[in-house]
């Protein structure tokens, strides 16, 4: 079926890997193998080929969208007779735990910052906007961490709203996976970047998720382009367990780690623990809150084994 025929049946254009890779055109590779190695996650094999075939075409597409947005801003400034404020273009990246959102975000940050039109690219994760553990404990939400109710949504929305309003310096809280908590007094200042990449579980939620409050303002109201990183559930579970096992031998061995006790588990005990955590928390959150937002994304990247993207769907 041709792309034109597909477009009559779905709001998305669908590309297999080779079709998408061809859209790279003549965009040069601007990352070295060493730089790519530093960008990949603990559980991923990010290759030069993956960057060339998947992320370079995506960076080219985003550059077109961002350039168009800048032209639109210039038209508005000309109409109003004003000198425009620096308003960042916001890209959100959503998807399940362990799917590789952070790697996607880091690769895009590296690639987009090398385009001459927009050098300043900031990356913020929504983990920092989780309520502190003390608040979650008081509300009985420690086992709901990552669910919508565990976030300080008012602060997150104010953060993106201030950026889109041209506020010169906006602060974002920072999360530590070592202590499994928001770092007290650890705020990061974001000063009018050209692009902000916002990565997190909950960035695609819309008013449909809050039927009791039809006037609810959400992060998605301020996002210019949204990406959903997708994969089959059985792969997500496998990746989550494998990541847990690697943390057990790495980060969990740090005495300061919140999960230090997990480092003492046998491999069988660790697999059982990770499986329980996946089924009781992360899978539940995926089914209830994350997966239902997938079709709201501007672009859906679907992964197969080894975190290789096999299909891309782009909203018309």
Curated annotation (Swiss-Prot):
Q: Name one GO molecular function term.
A: pantothenate kinase activity
Pathway where it operates: Cofactor biosynthesis; coenzyme A biosynthesis; CoA from (R)-pantothenate: step 1/5
Q: What class of enzyme is it?
A: transferase
Whether DNA damage counts among this entry's keywords is: no
- The positions annotated for binding ATP are 95-102
The answer to keyword Cytoplasm applying to this record is yes
Matches recorded under Pfam families: PRK
Which keywords does the record carry?
ATP-binding, Coenzyme A biosynthesis, Cytoplasm, Kinase, Nucleotide-binding, Transferase
Q: Where in the cell is it found?
A: Cytoplasm
Gene Ontology terms describing biological process = coenzyme A biosynthetic process
One Gene Ontology cellular component = cytoplasm
Per its record, the protein catalyses: (R)-pantothenate + ATP = (R)-4'-phosphopantothenate + ADP + H(+)
Instruction: Return the EC number.
Output: 2.7.1.33
- First-listed, main subcellular location of the protein, grouped into a coarse class: cytoplasm
Q: Which InterPro entries does the UniProt record give? A: P-loop_NTPase, PanK, PRK/URK
Tree of life domain: Bacteria
Output the PANTHER family linked to this UniProt entry.
URIDINE KINASE
Per the record, the similarity remark reads:
Belongs to the prokaryotic pantothenate kinase family.
Q: What is this protein called?
A: Pantothenate kinase
UniProt gene name: coaA
């Amino acid at each position: 079926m041709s792309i034109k025929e597909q477009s009559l049946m779905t709001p998305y254009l669908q590309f297999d890997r080779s079709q998408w890779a061809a859209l790279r055109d003549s965009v040069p590779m601007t990352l070295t193998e060493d730089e790519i190695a530093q960008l990949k996650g603990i559980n991923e094999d990010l290759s030069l080929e993956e960057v060339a075939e998947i992320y370079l075409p995506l960076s080219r597409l985003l550059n077109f969208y961002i350039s168009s947005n800048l032209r639109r801003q210039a038209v508005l400034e000309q109409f109003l007779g004003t000198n425009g404020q620096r308003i960042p273009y916001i890209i959100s990246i959503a998807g399940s735990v362990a799917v590789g959102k952070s790697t996607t975000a880091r690769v895009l940050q590296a690639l987009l910052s090398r385009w001459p039109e927009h050098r300043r690219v900031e990356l913020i994760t929504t983990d920092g906007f989780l309520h502190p553990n003390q608040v979650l404990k008081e509300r009985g939400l420690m086992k709901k961490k990552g669910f919508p109710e565990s976030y300080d949504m008012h602060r997150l929305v104010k953060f993106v709203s201030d950026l889109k309003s041209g506020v010169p310096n906006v602060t974002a809280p920072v999360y530590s996976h070592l202590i499994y908590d928001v770092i007290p007094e650890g705020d990061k200042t974001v000063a009018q970047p050209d692009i902000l990449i916002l990565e997190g579980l909950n960035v695609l939620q819309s008013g449909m998720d809050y039927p009791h409050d039809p006037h609810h303002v959400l992060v998605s109201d301020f996002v210019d382009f949204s990406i959903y990183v997708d994969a089959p559930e059985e792969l997500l579970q496998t990746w989550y367990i494998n990541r847990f096992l690697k943390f057990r031998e790495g980060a969990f061995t740090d005495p300061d780690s919140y999960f230090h006790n997990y480092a003492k588990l046998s491999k069988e005990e660790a697999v059982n623990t990770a499986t329980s955590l996946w089924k009781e928390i992360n899978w539940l959150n995926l089914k209830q809150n994350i997966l239902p937002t997938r079709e709201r994304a501007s672009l859906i990247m679907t992964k197969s084994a080894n975190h290789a993207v096999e299909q891309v769907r782009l909203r018309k």
